[in-house]
Amino acid sequence: MKTIKKNKKLPLTQAALRRKAINAGVKFIAEQTVFISEDTKFGKNVLIEPYVVIASKVSVGNNVTIKSFSHLEGSKIGNNVVIGPYARLRPGTKINNDVKIGNFV
């Protein structure tokens, strides 16, 4: 019989990660279609539309909208930003404040 070590930290499920984000003030249009990484950092007044993937090492500023079918990875997003729809932000991407980003970035 296998047991789990007491001190081993188990990764949070997607439902738990989304609930944590909601409790921090993030708004989802269809939360069950969004996947976020455990290390994602969210500012205030963030709206995430359906079918978004936020992979590891992403920080999202205040007043940000992430539109449908966008994929973010290793990116830093400033304040007052609109991303997507269909945007792909690759590792190392830095989006300044007051920017609108379309697809294929």
Where are the regions that the model predicts?
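Structured N-terminal alpha/beta-domain signature
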Residues: M1-K6, E49, K67, G84
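Extracellular beta-strand solenoid repeats
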Residues: K27-I29, F35, K41, L47, ...
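Terminal amphipathic alpha-helical/low-complexity segments used for targeting or macromolecular assembly
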Residues: M1-T33, S37-N45, N80, D98, ...
